[in-house]
């Protein structure tokens, strides 16, 4: 299941959905907006996306990881809009018979979302805006695996 939404993510509700099927392991990742970075305090982060294309790309990755790591269930939720420090940005939950598969799939999804998914992120600081670019180390992980 994938969602791209403005509202905050209800982590407990999403976790319950992962447990509906008989599984041996559940792995979650919750991305949180940071209060500051190396260049200063962050007032908020603004995330934009390409409606339709974003969902399509995330659905493709959900299908890929479900098959590759034999997942019983997979949930990917990413927010857009203005997000304040401390609020959740992204939720990834993977469920599988074995923990190794659930961990690998979850990590791959996060790396994919950071590098390949059509989201644009801008940090608003007191007197400046900073466009957030993907990191080369994350890009290398995706090239190796996908």
What do the PLM-derived regions correspond to, one by one?
Residues 1-88, 97-107, 111-146:
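N-terminal, polar/charged subdomain of small-to-medium soluble alpha/beta proteins
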Residues 93-95:
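Short hydrophobic/aromatic beta-strand micro-patches
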């Amino acid at each position: 299941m994938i969602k791209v939404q403005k509202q905050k993510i209800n982590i407990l509700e999403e976790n319950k959905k992962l447990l509906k099927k008989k599984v041996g392991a559940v792995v979650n990742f919750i991305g949180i907006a940071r209060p500051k970075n190396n260049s200063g305090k962050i007032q908020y982060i603004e995330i934009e996306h390409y409606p339709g294309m974003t969902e399509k790309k995330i659905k493709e990755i959900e299908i890929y990881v479900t098959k590759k790591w034999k997942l019983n269930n997979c949930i990917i939720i990413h927010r857009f809009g203005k997000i304040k420090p401390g609020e959740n940005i992204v939720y990834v939950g993977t469920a599988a018979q074995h923990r190794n598969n659930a961990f690998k799939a979850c990590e791959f999804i996060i790396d994919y979302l950071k590098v390949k998914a059509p989201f644009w992120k801008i940090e608003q600081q007191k007197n400046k805006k900073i466009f957030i670019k993907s990191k080369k180390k994350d890009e290398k992980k995706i090239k190796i695996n996908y």
